Amino acid sequence: MSQIKIILFRGGFAGDLITTLHHMNCFRELTPEGKIEIDSSLLTLQRNRNDMTIEDKDQYLNKHPIISCCDPEFALKHKNQTLMITCSNTSMASYFCKRFYQYHPYMADEISLAEYDTSFAEWSHFWSPKFKRSIDVSDIFTNDNFLSKLDIVLNDNKIKLFNDWKKINKKSFLDHKETSGR
């Protein structure tokens, strides 16, 4: 099987965490709010890049060992090197959508949280069957063996980062669950 080079996800769904766990050299920091910051050069395809041709995107991909990506059309071109992040549990998906707004509050001017939640479900339903490799983050807080689903070589740094991320984000998930009634 070919190496993972693209982590495909929607904002808020732990894409930068999964990217970092695949390639620790891109890690910059874990913020007190639980957001993973990665090397900014790997974020190019996290936003709409209609200004880039497919060739530009291919050149960008070839310059990096892994990228964090929200462009499913481009990722599909490289589907054998793509890991898609999904979330089949609606309560967890709602949390991850809300988490996106926590880090990017300006997005509320473009799309409501309810619309983002719906758009994630539609996006996931449409794109998931097109990718052979995916990881469902529904059990990221409850599955003690979650990291084994990534099929990566683990070391102490990766395990510590994951556990630190999980500790911060699990608390905010439990707060979300309590206030949302889901």
Show where each model-derived region lies.
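PAPS-dependent sulfotransferase catalytic core
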Residues: M1-H64
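PAPS-dependent sulfotransferase catalytic domain
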Residues: I54-Q59, K63-T179
